[in-house]
């Protein structure tokens, strides 16, 4: 009798365990646990890009043949009073792109054409990039980009162009690198997310508008500024020279230059002087976005 009772108890416990296991599997299928974002771990002995004396074998932790990282920003303003276009916040430059130049200032473009994309919104809106476990959700990132990454032919047209032309040339964002440290989405989607996330991070850290305004330089219509004064204000804030772009005698953009320690996902950016000269000379106008 005792043996029968023990056997029945054993069967009951086994059945309960199976039922609980099945219920748990159904639960995690319907409500998947967010995967944690795995940042890559690269050797501390890897040199900065463009500073290595020998070839670096770990191509997921060393950006090559690029390695001179440029963060380019627009200052778009109408020639006359505000047009229908949205130029972004009045007190902020907007993003042009994040570029991966070679150490000599030349660059590759439209790499890995088979991985080109047609939509950024569709990818960043996917459930896999909005479940949590990420530094910022894909949809929140899109909201930031819609404010600070403006294109004159539509924002998404610019985003797609920048990723296909420059993002796909960042070799430390290759799919095989994500196989090494994991991702919360497909490797291809994760790379797209990371390109735009890192570009936004850099933009939010480096504020050219306030670097100038702290030196008493603000957009105005009635008088030009000395280009050297503006250049010095930007350099004081960044710690290195900053490349300024002008169209005629109007300021239209700035570009910050960096070297990189570790892969692009490390975000270990090291400011350096530009390899290209500024195109702004003499007296230049910084036009308000509201127009003149």
Curated annotation (Swiss-Prot):
Listed transmembrane segments: none
Source organism superkingdom: Eukaryota
Main location: other
Record-annotated active site: 96, 162, 166
Protein name from the UniProt record: Ribonuclease T2-like
Localization (cell): Vacuole lumen; Cytoplasm
Keyword Ribonucleoprotein tagged: no
Disulfide bridge positions per record: 42-61, 50-103, 60-177, 111-169, 246-280
GO BP term (any one): RNA catabolic process
Any one GO CC term of the record: cytosol
GO molecular function: ribonuclease T2 activity; RNA binding; RNA endonuclease activity
Keyword terms: Cytoplasm, Disulfide bond, Endonuclease, Glycoprotein, Hydrolase, Lyase, Nuclease, Signal, Vacuole
Record field: catalytic activity: a ribonucleotidyl-ribonucleotide-RNA + H2O = a 3'-end 3'-phospho-ribonucleotide-RNA + a 5'-end dephospho-ribonucleoside-RNA + H(+)
UniProt record similarity statement: Belongs to the RNase T2 family.
InterPro entries: Ribonuclease_T2_eukaryotic, RNase_T2-like, RNase_T2-like_sf, RNase_T2_His_AS_2
């Amino acid at each position: 009798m005792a043996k029968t009772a023990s056997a029945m108890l054993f069967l009951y416990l086994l059945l309960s365990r199976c039922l609980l296991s099945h219920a748990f599997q159904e639960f995690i299928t319907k409500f998947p646990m967010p995967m944690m974002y795995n940042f890559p771990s690269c050797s501390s002995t890897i040199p900065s890009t463009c500073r290595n004396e020998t070839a670096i074998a770990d191509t997921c932790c060393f950006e090559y043949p690029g390695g001179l990282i440029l963060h380019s920003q627009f200052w778009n303003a109408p020639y006359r009073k505000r047009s229908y276009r949205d130029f972004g916040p009045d007190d902020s430059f907007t993003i042009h792109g994040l570029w991966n130049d070679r150490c000599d200032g030349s660059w590759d473009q439209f790499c890995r054409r088979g991985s080109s994309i047609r939509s950024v919104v569709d990818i960043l809106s996917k459930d896999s990039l909005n479940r949590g476990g990420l530094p910022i959700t894909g949809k929140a990132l899109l909201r930031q980009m819609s404010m600070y990454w403006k294109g004159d032919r539509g924002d998404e047209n610019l985003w797609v162009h920048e990723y296909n032309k420059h993002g796909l040339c960042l070799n430390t964002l290759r799919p095989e690198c994500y196989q090494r440290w994991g991702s919360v989405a497909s490797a291809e989607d994760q790379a797209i997310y990371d390109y735009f996330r890192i570009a936004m991070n850099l933009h939010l850290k480096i504020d050219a508008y306030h670097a100038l305004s702290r030196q008493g330089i603000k957009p105005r219509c009635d008088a030009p500024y000395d280009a050297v004064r503006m250049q010095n204000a930007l350099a004081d804030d960044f710690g290195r020279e900053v490349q300024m772009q002008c169209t005629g005698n109007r300021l239209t953009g700035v570009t910050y230059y960096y070297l990189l320690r570790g892969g692009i996902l490390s975000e270990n950016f090291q400011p350096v002087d530009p390899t290209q000269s500024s195109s702004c000379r003499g007296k230049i106008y910084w036009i308000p976005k509201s127009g003149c």
